[in-house]
């Protein structure tokens, strides 16, 4: 039996993150090596969320931001969801080598108005894994089926008061018309490229629900909302 070859490891925000140079695209490898990978999100979320916040992260990927969240709010106060099932082993390994046993599920979350829980949905994987999404593009290398869970149910079960999101434009479907009782902080990467009109509609809905933009914690496409 051949021994597993040790993967390259980089330091991001004080955590060891493994790089799979065979599976990750050159662009992803470079972003991880230079520290560019989710740099803004990692920096801001450490200030935006506080110890004791209950954070539900959507789009946990390989766990780099998840680790920062776990350190900030406490392991027991974090739960993560990622649609790409191929990233779960990577995230769990990153959690293991850093000694933070964070909870992580493979699923797509939808609010009740958009269909809620039940069934499976197509998820399109890109070698640049940070742009894998529910939308097929020419760079899609394969499509997998992923279970759908209800956002409101998961919020209630975990008693979350905070949402962290980076889901390549799907934030519109997740947040617009969502019942966000109990949520007082949202931090997301806002993707304008799919549709500015839909982004504006989502923001109008959230503002009407009592959220305001926290300008001190908002930078570039990283948007912080509080109420």
Identify the function of each model-found stretch.
Residues 1-227:
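Phosphate/nucleotide-binding beta-alpha loop and adjacent structural elements of enzyme active sites
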